[in-house]
Every structure is written in structure tokens, then in C-alpha cells.
Amino acid sequence: MKKRVWELDAARGLALIGMIGIHLIYDLVELYGVWNWNPHWYQVFKNNYGAVFLLISGISVTLGSYPVKRGFQVFCCGFLCTAVTYGMYRLGFAGKEILIYIGVLQCLGLCMMLWPLFEKLRSPWLLALAAGMIALGLWLRGEAFSFPWLTVLGFVPYGFASSDYFPLFPNLGYFLVGAVLGRKLYREKKSRFPLENPPLKGLQWMGRNSLLIYLLHQPVLAAVVGLFAMG
């Protein structure tokens, strides 16, 4: 059995805690309106925090096997999130603001499935492509277009809204930067800090079970905050 890289599991677990915090604030402020708090710095933090997951995923893809299979699984989990939010909206349990189009799981899945197209490129070319994707994606954030069919890339149509939106630009760029880091830092495909009894067990556990935690945490948070709001 292949030994896991414990520090990447711990980093993924720590990143999950940050995202859970972001979703808790979303539920309190935007979904139920029980807390009036929305400073500018937090908006910047929230809008860019997903890059952490893309970087970690990019590092990890250089260590694992079957990225297309794994990516398809993650994408399907993301599609499940979209289906659930759409069902909640259609059944009247939530407003349109809850809908998820191209969320972080769908983006991660697409990046993994696309990785074989970039895998043979040398690292300088990957970094050049990543820089172009990131620059284009950051520019697209301030633009709107009259066509909807390139939304997955970051070309947002007029009136578009999504509670979780991670287009390929700039996020595929962050993923490719992570892949370059993975090549550099994990050439031997093993931990850089080999320990008999690695620390941060809780974070490691979260990192190993990140997909399940991501799928379950928001319904639990929404239910708890909803009960709090009603009380």
C-alpha cells in the first residue's frame, strides 16, 4: 500500500477548516441574515481562498495515479452539490442565491481530468501557461458577457449568480503552479518530513477524508444555523 504524504493531508485538513469557516459566515450573513458582517478584506479573502485547494491538489496530482478517474469522481460529487441546491431552490426551501454552478469540487475534478494534457510539458512551460490563465481569470472577474456557454472558463454572462463559482481561469493556473511545486518538492514521491509518528493527527484525518467532509459540512452548518435563526 502506498504511504500517504502526511504533511499534504495536514495542509488539506487545515485548508478545510478555513473553508468551513467561510461557509459558516456565509450561512450567518447571507443565507439567514442573522449577522451583519461583511468587511472588504473578508470578501478578498473569501474570493481567493480556493486557490489554496487548487495548489494542494496540483501538488498531489504529481504523486498519485489515475487522475482522470479520481477527477471524474470529484466532479460527480460537485455535480451532486449542484443538483441538491437546485432541488432546494425548486422546492422552495431556499432562494436562488443558494444555487451552485461550477463549484470548487467541479473545478478540482476538471483540473484533474485535464492534467494528462499538460503532464508532459516542462515546468517552465507550465508556469508560463499558469501565469496566462491566472492573469486572464483575474481580468475576467470584472467583466460580463452576452453569451453563457463559456461560463466554465470564467466568461460570466449578465445576471449570473452562483454561491460557489470556480471557473477554470484562473483556477487551472493555480492547479498547474501546484503541479510544478509537486515536481520540485516531491521528486521521490514521498514525504519531505518522514516521521514514525507524524503530528497533527486530526488535520491528517480531515485531509484524508476531505471529500466526505466537504459534502457533509455545509448541510450540517446550514441546519444548525437555521435552527439558531428560528430560535
Model-derived regions: residue spans:
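Alpha-helical transmembrane segments and their immediate juxtamembrane cytosolic regions
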Residues: 1-231
